Amino acid sequence: MRDTDRERPLGLHPYPGMDRHRRWAIITGFLGAFLAVLAGILPVDQDTTRVQWTAGPDYAPVTAPLVSGRPLDLTITAPCAPLAQVPENTIVFSTLPQDAPGRISDGLVVQRVRDAAGDPVIEVAVRNITLLSVPLSTLRDPACETLHVRAETGILTAEFTGLERDADDAVRAAVPGSMRPQVTGVFTDLTAATAPDGLGESTVEVTVDSRYSSSPTLLKLVLMVIGVLATLASVVFLHRLDGIDGRSGRRFVPRSWSRLSGVDGVVIGVLGFWHLVGANTSDDGYLLTMARSAGPSGYMANYYRWLGSPESPVGWYYEILRVFAEVSTASPWMRLPTLVCGILSWLIISREVVPRLGRLARTWRGPRWTGAALFLAFWMAFNNGLRPEPVIALGALLTWSLVERSIATRRLVPGVAAIGVAAFSLGAGPTGLMCVAALAAGAREFVRMVRRRAQVVGWAAILGPVLAVGLALLYTVFADQTLAAVLEATRIRTELGPSLPWYGEKERWEALFGVSADGGVARRFPVLLMLMCLVLVSAVMLRRGRIPGAAAGPSRRLIGVIAGSLLFLVFTPTKWTHHFGVFAGLAGALAVLAVIALRSSTVSLSRNRWLVWAALCLVVGLSTATDNTWWYVSDYGIPFSDSFPAIGGVQIQYVAFVGGFVCLLIAGLIHSGILPDDPGAALRVRIRQAVPFLRTHADTPASRRRDGGSGDTA
């Protein structure tokens, strides 16, 4: 902290109690950051579960589906003599039920069958591999004691104990590697009436892989609560330190938020209507099952793709679905967070983004309606399901809005809040990486502001809250998991995939331009229109240095955010077109800016207007060069769901391409001077020049002047 007024930045002055606030900002900030990092190694309570099944006396099967699919270990023991007396074609033990399609290929089966020579044998098979096939005569040997099967990590063994090894070692087998069978219970064809005497002593023991079924200890819970409170306190003290500029703080939610306009009513009404009748996303089914199974299993397990590993470190959003599933699994109820995100996204656009983009955006209704149209086009096509894209779309828009507010108000707290929102957006899904682009767009102005204020309050008082807020996501990542569990889940994801490199991004665009639900009309059109708007505003910005009628700084940063987001999208491990849903909010803001750019003199030139029309025709043509396909049952009864859209038997794409070619041709003729700069104005002049030849002498301009000046009223 500087001691002299000469060294203190102009306009920043200490206030009474500043030193106390500075000390507490340092203490609470670094304490919150330290406890967030510590959360991953704090102790947890892990439940170890074992399933023990004894065959007799009723031989009742037990259903025990495992969240992880495969156990840590499995042990089967059965006496030899009774085993030799089971009826023919009988399954003695199985880890999958009779009608399971993968009973032999995925499970473990002990059964009596006949071998290739027609002799009766007891066969032990695991995952399509026959470990043992021993004749019944061998089992009747008094030396044979028990069948012992042991499956554990790294090896699978099966043997009939008590028998001497023979040359072929037919009574013992071992298979290295992870050959543990899939287990959904213990099943048998035997009943109390058909089972031989003595077989009731058989046992099956399963140790459940419950490494992820853990809960925080009291120590961990207390420390995490302290860390969260310390983080919130550090933000409060940083807010107090923002007062060194002598200005009063702004309302967090301006009064204008409570006033609804006509466009607000239309957007909210469309979102509500589409919430009830609109199409869902392709992953809603398995995400709903994950949410329903999270309660009994004790954690959010991804059974669908990654062997029941937890949705961590990205996936806190699914915990919200878990809470909702405990109330009801009705589709409108489960998708209520999506609707809330949509409404909040539009309110941010209309109340934060539009005023920030300048005077013309505030006073002219055209940009607001255009932004609403593109926002709804994105939201209805991509964001009406259970996937996390709506949360990330809201997070990206809110991050950029907070950055702009921080720059406009010259306050640190909005910028720090933007860092926290960006972190939680990244924690909702890999596409949340786009929020880094929003932070990077305003980084220069924010760092300049931090350096200026650090000369008065010190660096530690600012960095402490920044670190605490940025690392607060770790409290959700390690709420009931350990660092080891999260690293294991990450390893499983990387090994099993899909985990595509950055240069695999072409697959996303190939899917978008493919004829499928991934590249349907509804998905392709908003993405291409967003790209067209991006090219338009970038061209005007490069030509004029700014967009007339729009604020220069926010306009440049918005362009940078969207361009950077498209760049960061290549680093996501999966390449699905539904990821484009994260652009819903930013695309709406870009549409507002694009309409303002159309009024500039750069685009007002006749040649450039025709080029814009040609680009729009190209977007329509490319968007309709596919089926109007939606996912699953949402495709029932949809027009053109199995054909390209057409009017009167003529495909729209051809009409659009022809129109685009005509517009491009006119622009070329104007550029070369063959046509005048404004063909419409030139045509009107030609018509006016021809009018005297069509009028009577009494109706000429000269006669009208003469008659008007005579004063004759007869």
Cite the ranges covered by each PLM segment.
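Start-transfer (signal-anchor) and selected internal transmembrane alpha helices
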Residues: 2-43, 210-274, 354
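Juxtamembrane membrane-water interface segments that cap and precede transmembrane helices
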Residues: 200-212, 314-328, 494-522, 636-650
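Short hydrophobic/aromatic helix or loop-helix immediately within or flanking a transmembrane segment
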Residues: 292, 306-341, 425, 432
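Transmembrane-helix motifs of polytopic, lipid-linked glycan transferases
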Residues: 336-364, 370-371
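Membrane-embedded helix bundles of polyisoprenyl
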Residues: 364-406, 410, 414-440
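Perimembrane helix-loop-helix junctions
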Residues: 402-406, 434-467
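Hydrophobic, aromatic-rich transmembrane alpha-helices
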Residues: 526-549, 663-671
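Transmembrane helical bundles and short interhelical boundary loops of multi-pass, membrane-embedded
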Residues: 607-714
